[in-house]
From Swiss-Prot:
Gene3D superfamilies: 3.100.10.10. GO terms for cellular component: cytosolic large ribosomal subunit. This is Large ribosomal subunit protein uL15. Binds to the 23S rRNA. Residues 1-65 are annotated as: Disordered. PROSITE patterns: RIBOSOMAL_L15 (PS00475). It comes from the Bacteria. The keyword rRNA-binding applies. Residues 21-31, 42-52 have a biased composition (Gly residues).
Amino acid sequence: MKLHELKPAEGSRKVRNRVGRGIGSGNGKTAGKGHKGQNARSGGGVRPGFEGGQNPLYRRLPKRGFTNPTRKEFAVVNLEKLNRFEDGTEVSPELLLETGVVSNAKDGIKILGNGKLEKKLTVKANKFSASAVEAIEAAGGKTEVI
């Protein structure tokens, strides 16, 4: 094989389809837009969700729910992430932020019981799941709600 015999891989190069450039191209005259009407015009077309004047789906269905203005969002930490600390460490939200376990404390920290805890720790957080409290105390540690 020589340099002048190199060819691009099959299907790697697609020729751009130039519409409205002669009837022989197969996309001349109306350029694939059909005859007249809203969709044939420049900038034409209907907005998303428009159903031709029929009452659209988003208006046929009833409204549901509301946005709770006092919603609290907690940063979640699983037990397995706490194994990085030494035995006897007091794990506080400040320590979790410092060590990068959580990047944003949001409205507080909630400890969940996913994974296995092998260290004896004193954990301070805003919320605990029941399984997390059980696992921390089983490992000989303490939980403290702040």
